[in-house]
Each structure stands twice: as structure tokens, then as C-alpha cells.
């Protein structure tokens, strides 16, 4: 029972997310959608100058931790939208819908 464990090299590129101009693709996609939304609503592309500090701020944060954007998005998916935290004393991923459909919960 003296078997050697197999050793394999895990490269850093295999552990970090794909980046676009220094920002993870999920965050870059959100920024691009926000830029399109600004153009449609305001109809002036000069307001997209606001996007540059956000992009470089996200880039500085991602330089320290590649998964920081994923952690924030995960927080927004769980605790950020938890409406019953006062009832349960913390964030829960509740399987119950906010509104009950008129036909019940699929029993009839």
C-alpha cells in the first residue's frame, strides 16, 4: 500500500477565466450591454466615457484576483436577490416563487 501519488502540473492559465482587455468575459459582456443601453437611451455616445473608469477599475481588481468578478456575480445571484433574509436570518436560495401562479404549484 505504498503507492506514489501521481503528480500533474496545473498551469495558471487553466485556473483563471478568459479575459478580454484585462477583464473577464462575463464582466466585459455586461459592460458592452450597458454601453449599448446607454447609446439607445441617451442617443449620445459621448456618455460612454463613464464606461472607461468602470472598465479600468474592474481591470485593477481583476489583476489582484481573477475570480473577483465571479464572486460578485455569485453574490448578486444569491444574497443580492434574497428577499426572505429577514425571515430566515440570512440569504437562502428559496425554491418557492415570489408569486404563486393561479393554478397552484403544478398540482392540478
Curated annotation (Swiss-Prot):
Transmembrane segments: 22-42
Location of the protein in the cell: Membrane
GO annotation, cellular component aspect: membrane
Entry membrane topology: Single-pass membrane protein
Primary location group: membrane
Intrachain S-S bonds: none
Pfam families: VirB3
Keywords, sorted A to Z: Crown gall tumor, Membrane, Plasmid, Transmembrane, Transmembrane helix
InterPro entries associated with the record: T4SS_VirB3/TrbD/AvhB
Chain's role: VirB proteins are suggested to act at the bacterial surface and there play an important role in directing T-DNA transfer to plant cells.
Annotated family: Belongs to the virB3 family.
NCBIfam families: PRK13854.1 (NF010428)
Name of the protein: Protein virB3
Species of the source: Rhizobium radiobacter (Agrobacterium tumefaciens)
Lineage: Bacteria, Pseudomonadati, Pseudomonadota, Alphaproteobacteria, Hyphomicrobiales
Amino acid at each position: 500500500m505504498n503507492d506514489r501519488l501521481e503528480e500533474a502540473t496545473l498551469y495558471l492559465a487553466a485556473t483563471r477565466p478568459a479575459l478580454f482587455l484585462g477583464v473577464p468575459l462575463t464582466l466585459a459582456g455586461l459592460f458592452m450591454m450597458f454601453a449599448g443601453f446607454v447609446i439607445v437611451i441617451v442617443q449620445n455616445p459621448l456618455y460612454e466615457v463613464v464606461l472607461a473608469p468602470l472598465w479600468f477599475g474592474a481591470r485593477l481588481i481583476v489583476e489582484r484576483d481573477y475570480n473577483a468578478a465571479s464572486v460578485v456575480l455569485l453574490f448578486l445571484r444569491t444574497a443580492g436577490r434574497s428577499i426572505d433574509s429577514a425571515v430566515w436570518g440570512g440569504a437562502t436560495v428559496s425554491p418557492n416563487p415570489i408569486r404563486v401562479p393561479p393554478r397552484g404549484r403544478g398540482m392540478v
